């Protein structure tokens, strides 16, 4: 059975894609009222603006009203996934090749549960990271969570835009 987050993702993802956005993450926060937080990114590597979030929010709100997936009162928050965005799908790793990433694992790998390094490649459900001077091979199914890291190199590129 799918979680409510997965159900929401299923009903909004296609509309967001049609609008030029990638659905990054759906999560619930708070208790009464619940907050449905939705993180989006641009499919064409453009920055996400406040106007983009507003457009996406209106579309998502209309869909959720029709689908009626959430029983209790809730508040909807749509935001950019940010510079240190989470990587939640395997395809994300190929999109961000050569970028620095922090990964937390569900269990120990070589005596560690946390790795930070550059993504070298992602194939066959494996992530190849360059951590310091060694290459680490991580099975995608072992990943608990992963986020991009804002490095000086990325920051300088942003300043040039």
Curated annotation (Swiss-Prot):
Asked if Ribosomal protein is a keyword of the record, the answer is no
Keyword Cytoplasm applies: yes
Gene3D superfamilies hit by this protein? Ribosome maturation factor RimP, C-terminal domain (2.30.30.180), RimP-like superfamily, N-terminal (3.30.300.70)
Q: Where in the cell is it found?
A: Cytoplasm
Which CDD domains does the entry link to? YlxS_C
A GO cellular component entry from the record: cytosol
What's a GO biological-process term for it? Answer: translation
**What are the record keywords, sorted?**
Cytoplasm, Ribosome biogenesis
The record's family statement is: Belongs to the RimP family.
Question: What does it do?
Answer: Required for maturation of 30S ribosomal subunits.
Tell me the PANTHER family matching this sequence. RIBOSOME MATURATION FACTOR RIMP (PTHR33867:SF1)
Q: What is this protein called?
A: Ribosome maturation factor RimP
The taxonomic lineage of its organism, from the top, reads: Bacteria, Pseudomonadati, Pseudomonadota, Alphaproteobacteria, Rickettsiales
> What gene is behind this protein?
rimP
């Amino acid at each position: 059975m799918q979680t409510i987050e997965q159900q929401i993702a299923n009903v909004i993802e296609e509309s967001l894609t049609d609008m030029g956005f990638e659905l990054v993450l759906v999560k619930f926060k708070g208790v009464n009222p619940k907050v449905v937080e939705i993180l989006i990114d641009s499919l064409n590597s453009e920055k996400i603006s406040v106007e983009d979030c507003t457009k996406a929010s209106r579309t998502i709100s209309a869909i959720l009203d029709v689908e009626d997936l959430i029983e209790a009162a809730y508040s909807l928050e749509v935001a950019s996934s940010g510079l240190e965005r989470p990587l939640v799908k395997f395809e994300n790793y190929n999109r961000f090749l050569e970028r620095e990433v922090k990964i937390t694992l569900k269990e120990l790998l070589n005596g560690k549960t946390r790795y930070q390094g550059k993504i070298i490649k992602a194939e066959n459900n494996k992530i190849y990271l360059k951590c310091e001077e060694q290459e680490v091979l991580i099975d995608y199914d072992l990943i608990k969570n992963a986020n991009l890291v804002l490095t000086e190199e990325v920051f300088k590129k942003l300043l040039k835009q």
